[in-house]
Curated annotation (Swiss-Prot):
PANTHER family: 4-HYDROXY-TETRAHYDRODIPICOLINATE REDUCTASE 1, CHLOROPLASTIC-RELATED (PTHR20836:SF0), DIHYDRODIPICOLINATE REDUCTASE (PTHR20836). GO terms for biological process: diaminopimelate biosynthetic process; lysine biosynthetic process via diaminopimelate. It catalyses: (S)-2,3,4,5-tetrahydrodipicolinate + NAD(+) + H2O = (2S,4S)-4-hydroxy-2,3,4,5-tetrahydrodipicolinate + NADH + H(+); (S)-2,3,4,5-tetrahydrodipicolinate + NADP(+) + H2O = (2S,4S)-4-hydroxy-2,3,4,5-tetrahydrodipicolinate + NADPH + H(+). Its main location: cytoplasm. It is found in: Cytoplasm. (S)-2,3,4,5-tetrahydrodipicolinate binds at residues 149, 158-159. Catalyzes the conversion of 4-hydroxy-tetrahydrodipicolinate (HTPA) to tetrahydrodipicolinate. It comes from Xylella fastidiosa (strain 9a5c). Its EC number is 1.17.1.8. This is 4-hydroxy-tetrahydrodipicolinate reductase.
């Protein structure tokens, strides 16, 4: 039996994909079976890793788990491939539409999968703290401010929406503010405001590696689990 997991990286040309390629190559518990990029790759093999264009997805070799940080346009094809091959999927692709989220839930009846807007340990803790604050602060105002680099397309960020869901389930309607500036990796502020006082909970990511390490950790943990839709914090905390 192999001592490593064969990993498919989907969205390998993006910032997260590049971090995953680098960190997975340094981790003896993984072997990158294939890397998928949007357009035809410049080189079909790089550092021993075979690269495939998104249109060639069906041709990728066997893999034990897929990690996806891509765009919504390519997500559905990967989900279908993982279901067809009965392989777990870990996805951090944000901006999915309602039909894609429904497809995720349906796929969870057949394979173990994790969709998350943020794979850092700190964000998992922040979501937990926000839920607990929501329990204690009913009637307070809640504002969520997220800041990211200028190239991030979706707003509010997926992480901001996850934080918003954590307070919305407590009966609090959050307001969102999105900032796009410079090369900010990811800042999230959750502010609860009452009469004469306020509480601020903040998470700042200064290096994209925290998300990639978290995704690799979750990928190791989800392999071998029964089919279902798992939360990041189910596997990190």
């Amino acid at each position: 039996m192999d001592s490593f997991l064969r990993l498919l990286i989907h969205g390998a040309s993006g910032r997260m994909g590049q971090a995953l390629l680098r960190l997975a190559s340094e981790d003896p518990s993984f072997q990158v079976a294939a890397a998928v990029v949007g357009q035809a790759p410049d080189r079909h093999v790089s550092d021993g890793v075979p690269f495939f264009a998104a249109a060639e997805l069906a041709a990728v070799p066997a893999f034990d788990v897929a990690i996806d940080f891509s765009l919504p346009q390519g997500f559905s094809s990967l989900l279908a491939l993982c279901v067809a091959r009965a392989v777990p999927l870990v996805s951090g692709t944000t901006g999915l539409d309602s039909r894609q989220h429904e497809a995720l839930v349906m796929a969870g009846a057949q394979i173990p999968l994790v969709w998350g807007s943020n794979f850092s340990v700190g964000m998992a803790v922040l979501v937990n703290l926000v839920e607990r604050a929501g329990d204690a602060l009913s009637g307070w105002d809640c504002d969520i401010v997220e800041s990211h680099h200028v190239h991030k397309q979706d707003a509010p960020s997926g992480s901001a929406l996850t934080l918003g869901e954590a307070v919305a389930c407590k009966g609090i309607a959050p307001r969102y503010t999105s900032l796009r500036a410079g090369d900010i990796v990811g800042d999230h502020l959750v502010q609860f405001t009452g009469l004469g006082e306020r509480i601020e909970l903040v998470h700042r990511a200064t290096n994209r590696d925290v998300f990639a390490r978290g995704a690799l950790y979750v990928a190791r943990r989800v392999v071998g689990r029964v089919p279902g839709c798992y939360r990041v914090r189910d596997l990190i905390m």
